[in-house]
A protein has these predicted regions:
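C-terminal catalytic "cap/lid" subdomain
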Residues: 1-259
């Protein structure tokens, strides 16, 4: 079975952790591909350029200047750094975005009303991806050549417009399109019931528990899109979704998501 691994959070900023993750990723049995974010670095670059990052419910509002920044950071530095590191460890990785070979197309996200029922947000140049937007023939051909795709979260609308897409959405859509298992790796051991206690990992979360965790504020910020995409992946036929630490890719543990 194919495994789609998504890496994000602060892992990309931790050289030692990233190095261990890449070694474990290479050792992971079976066919696999990698999807990555890069939001922390993108935020730093924005601030250095005098652009204030705007986040709403864990998702980045992307105006024209922000789009330039995230494209440079995600498809440039982050993607090529990961590919170079994997290549140095003997993994024949190839860096890709959704624009390459038109393999992932996105639709501009329409303005949305937030959970409060009042606030309307225009996310700007942000794209939504569906499993039907993935060119599975292209992805399978790349995998069949013995290459390991490393996808950034920059896609396009097919008409020349670049779009910023949440990396968790890209990973869940690719997994659904390929019928692959999905493993989302970040700096925590899993979803925590107490953010100040790294050992408070919730082993299983179903839909009802997710709603309870949202209502209590236990799950908020960047964890919201992670879990929303995890449940979307399961509803679209992904056989298994696990959220876990990047340092424990090959071990048991983490949080298993169930419908």
């Amino acid at each position: 079975m194919i495994t789609v691994v998504k890496i994000g959070g602060h892992v990309l900023d931790d050289e030692a952790l990233l190095g261990r993750f890449c070694k474990d990723f290479i050792a992971l049995a079976g066919t696999k591909l990698l999807v990555h974010g890069g939001g922390a670095l993108a935020g730093d670059v924005q601030k250095a350029l005098g652009i204030e990052p705007q986040m709403v419910e864990g998702r980045r509002v992307t105006d024209a200047d922000t789009l330039r920044v995230v494209t440079m950071v995600y498809s440039g530095w982050c993607n090529k750094r990961l590919v170079a590191l994997l290549q140095s460890l003997g993994c024949n990785a190839i860096g890709l975005s959704g624009c390459d070979a038109g393999c992932i197309t996105s639709a501009v996200r329409p303005p949305r009303v937030l959970a409060d029922g009042k606030t309307k947000v225009d996310y700007g140049f942000v794209g939504d991806v569906r499993p039907s937007s993935i060119d599975t023939r292209f992805v399978r051909n790349i995998l069949g050549m013995g290459l390991v795709p490393v996808f950034s979260a920059i896609n396009h609308d097919g008409r020349g417009q670049l779009l910023n897409t949440n990396a968790d959405t890209v990973a869940s859509s690719i997994a659904a399109a390929l019928g692959a298992r999905l493993v989302c790796c970040f700096e925590k051991e899993g979803v925590l019931s107490d953010v100040d206690d790294p050992s408070s990992v919730i082993p299983f979360i179903d839909s009802a528990e997710f709603e309870r965790l949202k209502a209590s504020g236990t799950v908020a910020g960047g964890m919201l899109p992670k879990l929303e995409n995890a449940f979307a992946a399961l509803r679209q036929g992904v056989p298994e979704v696990i959220l876990k630490s990047a340092s424990g890719l090959l071990s048991r543990g983490g949080t298993k998501i169930c419908l």
